[in-house]
């Protein structure tokens, strides 16, 4: 068995812990200190919409026994990766055309690399986090951690039998903190678990594991409960501008800071509940899970970007963009966002698709994912209405004689197709009858 994963607490050694300030990591940090480890706490500022005071988290870690505690601002990098995902269409999970924007995988890519980089600065080469053995994050953090520090060792209290035996549940952890002089009041248990960052929120587990429990039990943290009749949502016109694939302006206001742009996009989309979806997905280990997601800003930018893609690029380029995006989305989900095959797909889209995306899209947002596109403008549009106008136009690009020639050339593949269908009929692959959708194939001429 690999010695990369430590199954017992490394006493006397520095252990970095991804510290959220919640019950689990608070109890784990105190327990590790009491059992002889030297814990270092690292907190990622990912712009979580449900976090009120980031600066209080490192202070809390020091109270629980951390040797040192640092707050790492990851927002700029997260915004950068979010834009890269939009540029490359790195989204592979959707239901009925409603997309999940891989916001948790993007957050893990940033957290896993930036926290381990900070640990290296402190000569901390053992890392622990709160991910469980059934989820995706245990593998994502494992990959990103070892990519960033090849000498990294992994210690997770939740894989340590001694920790589980002593502090195996929320009640035990709460009692442990109280017994050690900390006034910890357990929060009221929600009917589901929430994880969030600046790009989006994930609601899953507990009651949401049952498919007969839906979005109506969720209290959005980035938007409104648009499905409720008592929630007023007014229609709103919104304009989004891109320059060379980069979102630069919302409603005429230019943003040089991508973090501020995402925050404003979240506010705009959130007023309507835009970007919420209910998805059944395949986890990395191939078992299916269910999540309800929020991503108002990502959805807003994605709509505008894809509208410009469809108006600027040709059919084959769009097809390749979509195929590559599906593959890239899956790699991102699996924790492979910085693997060579993912970088290849990303750079292809960013170079050959995104660089041409300059323009402005105006649309009307209503409730949830209900919207209408009102206008599309770009100096790079290849959509030219005069080419296919139903009215008579001067200097038409082609005339009836040209189309006759084009149709005549189609005779070649039509004849070939008919011959192939005849072969399939003779071999029994197709059955010809009066009720068949191809009843005339057995007739000559």
UniProtKB/Swiss-Prot annotation:
Gene Ontology biological process terms, A to Z: argininosuccinate metabolic process; L-arginine biosynthetic process; urea cycle
Gene Ontology MF term list: argininosuccinate synthase activity; ATP binding; protein homodimerization activity
HAMAP family to which the protein is assigned, alphabetical: Arg_succ_synth_type2
Species name: Pasteurella multocida (strain Pm70)
Binding site for ATP: 18-26, 44, 130, 132, 137, 195
Major subcellular location class: cytoplasm
GO terms under cellular component: cytoplasm
Binding site for L-citrulline: 100, 136, 140, 193, 202, 204, 281
Subcellular location: Cytoplasm
NCBIfam families named in the record: argG, PRK05370.1
EC top class, as a word: ligase
EC number of this enzyme: 6.3.4.5
Keywords associated with the record: Amino-acid biosynthesis, Arginine biosynthesis, ATP-binding, Cytoplasm, Ligase, Nucleotide-binding
Protein name: Argininosuccinate synthase
Residues reported to bind L-aspartate: 132, 136-137
Record lineage: Bacteria, Pseudomonadati, Pseudomonadota, Gammaproteobacteria, Pasteurellales
Quaternary data: Homotetramer.
Pathway(s): Amino-acid biosynthesis; L-arginine biosynthesis; L-arginine from L-ornithine and carbamoyl phosphate: step 2/3
Catalytic activity: L-citrulline + L-aspartate + ATP = 2-(N(omega)-L-arginino)succinate + AMP + diphosphate + H(+)
């Amino acid at each position: 068995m690999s010695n990369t994963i430590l199954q017992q607490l490394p006493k006397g050694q520095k252990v970095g812990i991804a510290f959220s300030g919640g019950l689990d990591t608070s109890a784990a940090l105190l327990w590790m200190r009491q059992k002889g480890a030297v814990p270092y706490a690292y907190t990622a500022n990912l712009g979580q919409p449900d976090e009120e005071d980031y600066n209080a988290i490192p202070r809390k870690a020091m109270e629980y026994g951390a040797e040192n505690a640092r707050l790492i601002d990851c927002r700029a990098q997260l915004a950068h990766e979010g834009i890269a995902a939009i540029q490359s269409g790195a989204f592979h999970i959707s239901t009925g055309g409603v997309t999940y924007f891989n916001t948790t995988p993007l957050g893990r890519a940033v957290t896993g690399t930036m926290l381990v980089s900070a640990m290296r600065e402190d000569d901390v080469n053992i890392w622990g986090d709160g991910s469980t053995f059934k989820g995706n994050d245990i593998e994502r953090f494992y990959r990103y951690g070892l990519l960033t520090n090849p000498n990294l060792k992994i210690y997770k209290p939740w894989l340590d039998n001694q920790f589980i035996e002593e502090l195996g549940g929320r009640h035990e952890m709460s009692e442990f903190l109280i017994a050690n002089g900390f006034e910890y009041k357990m929060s009221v248990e929600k009917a589901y678990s929430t994880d969030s960052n600046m790009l989006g929120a994930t609601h899953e587990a507990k009651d949401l594991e049952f498919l007969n429990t839906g979005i109506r039990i969720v209290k959005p943290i980035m938007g409104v409960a648009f499905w409720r009749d008592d929630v007023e949502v007014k229609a709103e016109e919104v304009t989004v501008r891109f320059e060379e694939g980069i979102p630069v302006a919302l409603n005429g206001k230019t943003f040089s800071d991508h973090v501020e742009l995402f925050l404003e996009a979240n506010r705009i989309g959130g007023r309507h509940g835009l970007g919420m979806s209910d998805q059944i997905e395949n986890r990395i280990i191939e078992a299916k899970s269910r999540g309800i997601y929020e991503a108002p800003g990502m959805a807003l930018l994605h709509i505008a970007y894809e509208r410009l893609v469809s108006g600027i690029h040709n059919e084959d380029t769009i097809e390749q963009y979509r195929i590559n995006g599906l593959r890239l989305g899956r790699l991102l989900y699996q924790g492979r966002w910085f693997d060579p095959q993912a970088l290849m797909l990303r750079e292809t889209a960013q170079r050959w698709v995104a660089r041409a995306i300059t323009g402005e899209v105006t649309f009307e947002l209503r409730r949830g994912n209900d919207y209408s596109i009102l206008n599309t403008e770009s100096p790079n549009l290849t959509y030219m209405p005069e080419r296919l106008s139903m009215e008579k136009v001067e200097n038409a690009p082609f005339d009836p004689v040209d189309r006759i020639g084009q149709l005549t050339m189609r005779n070649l593949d039509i004849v070939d197709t008919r011959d192939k269908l005849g072969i399939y009929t003779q071999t029994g692959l197709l059955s010809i009858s009066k009720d068949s959708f191809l009843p005339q194939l057995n007739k000559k001429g």
